[in-house]
Structures are given as structure tokens and as C-alpha cells.
């Protein structure tokens, strides 16, 4: 919902950018079964044109302190391309016009994808590879499917930042 905060609890971040694929130890910190299920569900098996998505678990202890009952929990897709990777059509059609519909309907062991943003999977993945704890909290400012947006989100973000800092 608009103005809600989305946290990934002990849930996951999914990177569409392929960033972690360039680092040693990637398979040790990623949820390979989730990745395989998602790629198969999306019909991307064998597609060498798409960066292999990776899935990172959030730090459970840190996220348990921050993501309380006032936050929506789920899987966040980090799609740095902003346009096509987030299902936005320009004057060029998407390679898979049902991409967002598939993403919305995807479920794996009770995990559902709740939102898109652009960099949290890289932050979570690199942190895990370096032995750090990290989590991110996103402010939902638009719902493209419902064609709703929160144009006055700046004040809400300040409140969310304060809430997260108090919970750390």
C-alpha cells in the first residue's frame, strides 16, 4: 500500500543486476533454490541475455529489531535498469509483456515479491560477502498497478528514517 514501509524481514532481496555473480563466495551467501525456482517460473532458463538474478537473505537479527508489525514484509526486487527490468514499457515493447504479472503471482515457500527498488540486493549481498550485517527498509511511494502515487512522501520518509534509527 502507498505510504507503507516495506522491510524484508528474514525474507529476501533479489538482484536483477547480476552484481554478485562477479564475486567469489556468491553461491555460499545466496538462496540457490529460490533463484532456480524463480528463473524456471519466469521462463528464463537458458536465456543468456538476462543477468542471472541472485537472492540474498536479510540479516535476521538486525531485521527482527527493525521490521516490526508496522511494516510489510516480503521479497524486494532490486532492478537497477529502472525501465524494462521493472516492467516499464517505453515505445519499445518488453521482451515479456507478462513480466510484472508473473512477478506479482510468484510464490516460493510462502515468500512473495512485494516491491521493486534499485540497489538493496547489492547492499545486502556485498555486506554478507564481507561479513557485515545489513538490511534495508523501503518507503512505498507508488503503486503502478493501481496507478496511485504519494506525492507528499518526503515528510513520511523523515519519520521512517527516525523510526529505523530508534530501532537499531
Question: What are these language model-derived features?
Answer:
Residues 1-7, 11:
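Single conserved hydrophobic/aromatic residue that forms the stacking wall/gate
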Residues 12-33:
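Class I SAM-dependent methyltransferase SAM-binding "motif I" and its flanking Rossmann-like core
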Residues 12-13, 78-80, 118-120, 137-140:
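Fold-independent oxyanion-binding glycine-rich loops
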Residues 31-108:
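Active-site rim beta-loop-alpha module in soluble metabolic enzymes
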Residues 55-63, 69, 116, 120, ...:
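Generic structural signal for well-ordered, non-membrane alpha-helical segments
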Residues 106, 112-113, 168:
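Non-transmembrane, aqueous-exposed alpha-helical and coiled segments at domain scale
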Residues 121-153:
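Zn-dependent metallopeptidase/amidohydrolase metal-coordination segment
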Residues 144-168:
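His/Asp/Glu-rich mid-to-C-terminal helical/loop segments that flank catalytic regions of hydrolases
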Amino acid at each position: 500500500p502507498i505510504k507503507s514501509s516495506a522491510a524484508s524481514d528474514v525474507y529476501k532481496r533479489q538482484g536483477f543486476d547480476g552484481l554478485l555473480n562477479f564475486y567469489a563466495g556468491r553461491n555460499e551467501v545466496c538462496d540457490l533454490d529460490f533463484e532456480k525456482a524463480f528463473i524456471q517460473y519466469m521462463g528464463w532458463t537458458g536465456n543468456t541475455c538476462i543477468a542471472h538474478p541472485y537472492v540474498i537473505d536479510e540479516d535476521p537479527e538486525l531485521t527482527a529489531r527493525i521490521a516490526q508489525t508496522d511494516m510489510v514484509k516480503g521479497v524486494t526486487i532490486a532492478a537497477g535498469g529502472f525501465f524494462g527490468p521493472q516492467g516499464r514499457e517505453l515505445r519499445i515493447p518488453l521482451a515479456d509483456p507478462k513480466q510484472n504479472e508473473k512477478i506479482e503471482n510468484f510464490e516460493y515457500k510462502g515468500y512473495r515479491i512485494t516491491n521493486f527498488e534499485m540497489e538493496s540486493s547489492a547492499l545486502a549481498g556485498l555486506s554478507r560477502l564481507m561479513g557485515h550485517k545489513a538490511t534495508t527498509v523501503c518507503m512505498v511511494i507508488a503503486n503502478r498497478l493501481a496507478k496511485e502515487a504519494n506525492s507528499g512522501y518526503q515528510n513520511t520518509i523523515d519519520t521512517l528514517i527516525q523510526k529505523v534509527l530508534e530501532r537499531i
